[in-house]
């Protein structure tokens, strides 16, 4: 396990798509934290003080840059008509949203994460003892 924790942040603007209305720009903060080396966080600005966070696999983001990836709550794929755009769909019991994002911005963010944790070396950053402590009940009596 590595102890030299790193958090990467990148801001972007995704376009929220809705039928028969113009796209709405949404501020997004992308985060990568070596304490959870398999995941990325996309935090979407929902208003003056609100953010909604989605956590998904770093591999899902990488795979979605080149082909349709994901099943269920998060799917990512290149746009059919524009190779410079990636479509991100998010689904939850409270709603469904479709965003378009710059493929280059997402690729640049991923490259920065790979500079910190090389794909395939994520396990070197996982603190198994800490993870078990959080999962197991503290009172085992």
Curated annotation (Swiss-Prot):
GO cellular component, one term: cell septum
Protein's GO biological process: division septum assembly; sporulation resulting in formation of a cellular spore
InterPro entries: SsgB, SsgB_sf
Cell compartments where the protein resides: Cell septum
Pfam family, one: SsgA
Main subcellular location: other
Record keywords, A-Z: Cell cycle, Cell division, Coiled coil, Septation, Sporulation
Role played: Involved in sporulation-specific cell division. Required for early stages of sporulation. Important in the process of growth cessation prior to sporulation-specific cell division. Recruits cell division protein FtsZ to the future septum sites and tethers the contractile ring structure (Z ring) to the cytoplasmic membrane during sporulation. Stimulates polymerization and filament length of FtsZ in vitro.
Family from the record: Belongs to the SsgA family.
Subunit: Interacts with SsgA. Interacts with FtsZ (via N-terminus).
Protein name: Sporulation-specific cell division protein SsgB
